[in-house]
Amino acid sequence: MRRLKLKTGMLLILSAVLFLTGCTSGEKKSQDTDTRTKTAQRQKAWKKAETSPWGKYPETVTYTLGQMKGTGNSNLPEGETYENNAYTRYLKKILNVQNKNIFMESEEGYDEALNILVKDRNLPDIFLVSDRGTLEELVENDLIEDLTDVYKSCASDRIREMYEGYGDELLESGTFDGKLLALPETAIDHGPQLLWLRRDWIEQLGLTEPKTLEDAFFVIQAFQENRMGAERDEEPVGLVCDPGLVGTVSTSYSMDAIFENFGAYPEQWIRNPEGEIVYGSLTEETKNALSCLHDLYSRGILDPDFALRAQNNIRDLVVEGKCGAFFGLWWTPNNPLMDEYRQNKDADWQPYYLTSGARRQVEVYSTFRDNKYVVVRKGYEHPEIVMKVLSVLFDYSRYEADDTEEMNAYFALNVDPTARPLMINVDYNEATYMVTRHIREALYGSRMREELSAIEASYFDACKKYLGTDSPSVEEWAAYKSRITAVGLLVDASYHPPERKYMGDGDSEIPQTLQ
């Protein structure tokens, strides 16, 4: 009996052990299955993030960035930085990416700072290149990643459509030996230089607003003779001007508008009426324009100290109310006029689009030597980030999302575009005019606000507030003055930019620079 009880007890213990072993084995198999499932899901999430425009990374990806900052006030709200602002927070929310800026320089000092890093082979993961020679050096030394597959998998359909709208040449400018090594900024047409005049000075002197350039010169001469903006011990400034006379597609204070009114295109290759390709600086039209500028200088209309001026110095003259005339692009109210308006709301700057019969449409040949590009350091494990960021900022947030209020507010606040990581703009070629047409339609009631893109809606709100109050904010004034007043001039005039033909670095017909 005792032996039977012992056997029975041993059987019970053995059964329990086997039961527990079975449970443990089952739990381990279940845990292994859960682990494999989670691993597979995680790998799938990473794969989706790395191969789609808007896929979110399962873990935060931090990338180092070389950033170009604006020369003036960034207008970022207090407490916000280039690493923590509405753009970076939105990108972290949608993509789970975060930039860490390892160097920041203004446009004037950026190329020099980058060249030092290139020589030292100490490059950030992602950075901007604004000098063609530097880009070619990076390519020759195999220092940047191939982005061909990144563009195919992570560029949204709309972003590809934007690039394709410029023809093959734009993307080809960043392509070397069949590989896309640099993402170019789109060459959005900013329109011609407008003449900005102090209309309050015109009224104060009892003058008539100009209808021609010669009318405008008469007005500026009157500013000079009446010492407008000058203190007792100062000389009046006149028409301020960049020392180089000729500007780029995105700079103010040049004399391009005067050259163009003579049918001249200096420092550019053009096709003349006889069908010949000639250098614009050497044409008869350019000589006539230079003769006009010499006459303006002799009459005291052109700033007598223009040859000694720097961009910042010219900007200070405008902001401090020392001058009442300069040529600038449509966004001039954002920079520098907004800073003057903040100090003196009586300063009534008005743009004028003044053309003459001498102006003619020509075929202009352009290079990409002054273009900006975004590149990725060779060996960085997430090169797709650049295309994802561009797709979110310039497609998803503007056309698809409904949670971009904080970012949209930056447009009305006139936050400098350099607050965006990557610091290039990607948009349709005629985006400037399209936005203004849509805003005006909404203001006039022929388009619903809901039909506007995010950027259009933001400017629409600011312009509507401007029209609805006697004391608009500085930002509302700048939005209306730039988008409606300035661009509106060009829309109403049915402005068409000169036809441009882009050429690559290897173009054998035309030299890249005049030796």
Model segments located where?
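Bacterial N-terminal signal peptides that target proteins for export
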Residues: 1-10
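C-terminal motif of bacterial Sec signal peptides marking the signal peptidase cleavage site
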Residues: 18-22
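Conserved N-terminal structural module of periplasmic/extracytoplasmic solute-binding proteins
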Residues: 23-216, 260, 277-281, 401-403, ...
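Conserved small-residue motifs centered on glycine
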Residues: 48, 396-514
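Ligand-binding "clamshell"
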Residues: 136-149, 336-361
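Helix-loop-helix "hinge/cap" segment bordering the ligand-binding cleft or interdomain interface
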Residues: 148-153, 175-253, 271-317, 322, ...
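Glycine-centered hinge/linker elements that transmit conformational signals in sensory
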Residues: 274-303, 350-360, 444-455, 459
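Polar, glycine-rich mid-to-C-terminal structural blocks
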Residues: 294, 346-356, 362-440
